């Protein structure tokens, strides 16, 4: 009998906002993410540094367990601008692009 393995990635929910307009997060200054999203390491991200923003947006998109997190920490215009550069797990990218096909363009 073969044993099938289920990974955490296979069962972890991917949280997606109902609309991009709901993403009303900050756009200037320093983004301070809470420790329930950033378990260790850097938790402050500078809006003046795209590498910081890419790291912060990836954390929020991958680690959020509640829609309120993506609504609070992501901004629609910033997400649209960064989307082509974001290095996301395939399942996360696919789920967001299914919900918002305009991101794939």
Language model regions located:
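Long, compositionally biased intrinsically disordered regulatory segments in eukaryotic proteins
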Residues: 1-105
């Amino acid at each position: 009998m073969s044993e099938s393995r289920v990974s955490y990635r296979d069962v972890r929910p991917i949280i997606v906002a109902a609309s991009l307009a709901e993403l009303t997060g900050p756009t200037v200054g320093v983004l301070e993410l809470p420790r329930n999203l950033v378990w260790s390491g850097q938790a402050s991200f500078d809006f003046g540094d795209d590498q910081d923003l890419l790291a912060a947006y990836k954390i929020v998109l991958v680690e959020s367990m509640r829609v309120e997190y993506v609504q609070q920490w992501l901004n629609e215009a910033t997400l649209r601008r960064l989307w082509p550069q974001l290095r996301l797990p395939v399942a996360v990218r696919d789920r967001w692009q299914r919900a918002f096909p305009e991101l794939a363009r």
